[in-house]
Amino acid sequence: GEGQIVKSGSDELIVTGDNNYSGGTTISGGTLSAKDAASLGSGDVDIAENAKLELSQGTLDNNVTGGGQIVKSGSDELIVTGANDYSGGTTITGGTLTADHADSLGSGDIDNSGVLQVGEGELKNTLFGSGSLVKTGTGELTLSGDNSYSGTTTITDGTLIAAS
């Protein structure tokens, strides 16, 4: 349906199931957790500053905005798409976070303790942590952030440019 989820307060809300609502998701406080991105329906996701969206797997096709953060948890793969402009950063606690384009990762820092796979674009975000970076796809990926990550860097295809 056309309904929406509005998460408020400082506690955690866990959303399950393959939901089909289209009115969007607003996280104004605390953490909204879902094992699979399909639990978020098809509307935009707005994450307020100091709020979090925690996901483990699936494909996040929703546009993500706001000052909040995305947390990738669990050992599975989460794929993010779209030109997302959330600014609270991204934390990868485990598993793999895949973005075909760097624009899908918002503008905040990326704390990586898992695997970050990026296809193309300019990754302006600061990348830190012990996790690895994998360049995928035939395109060109430019790293222009003030990076200090200690994990491996692997190029499976295309070109990786370290600009800073």
Which positions does each model-derived feature cover?
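Surface-exposed loop/turn positions within long extracellular repeat scaffolds
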Residues: 1, 12-67, 80-130, 143-164
